[in-house]
Amino acid sequence: MELQQDIGFVFHEKWFDDWDSLIANSRHYGKYYKNYDETLLKEYLKRFRLDGKKKYKKLSKGEKLKFAFAFALAHHPKLLLLDEPGANFDQTFREEFHHILREFTADGTKSVILSTHITSDVDRFADYLLLLKKGRQLLYGDIESVRDAYRMVAGCFLYTSPSPRDYAASR
C-alpha cells in the first residue's frame, strides 16, 4: 500500500463515480492518499478549464482524462503511469500536457512511464524508449542511442485511380 502512495495513474478505464462532481470524486478518492492536496487539484482543474462542480458523467473523454491527470498529480506522486493519455487531447492541450510532464520531471526525482502510439510524444520528452509488440520487447535504449541506430519512417498511402484509358480497356 505504501508504494501506491507514490504512483499516479491515468488509464482509460472509468473509476470515478458518474453522479458525483469532480470535487466530490477527488475528496472521496483523495482520502486514500496521505499526500492528497485539494488545493493543487483545484489549481489543475482551473489550468485545464474544468469545472469542479460538474458531474463526472457529463465530461467528454478528453475531459475525463484531464481530470484523471489532475487527480494523479494532486497527491504528489514520484511516478506517473500514463496509458495513452494524449489520444483524446486536442493539439493545444497536448502541448500543455507535455509542458506539465517536463515540469513534473524537471528536478530529476520523479519519473513518467508513458504508453503511447503517438511517436511525436516520445520524441518530445522521452529519455528512454521501450518498444513492445504483443508484449515482447523489440527495442530498448536511451532515446539518443535509438535515434542513432534507427530512423523513424513516416509516410502516406497514395491512391491513384485508374486512368481513363485503363477504365476504357476494362469495359
Specify the residue positions occupied by each region the protein language model found:
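ABC-family P-loop ATPase nucleotide-binding domains
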Residues: Q5, F9-F67
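Conserved catalytic loops of ABC-family nucleotide-binding domains
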Residues: I100-L114
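ABC ATPase "signature
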Residues: Y140-G141
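Single conserved hydrophobic/aromatic residue that forms the stacking wall/gate
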Residues: Y159-S170
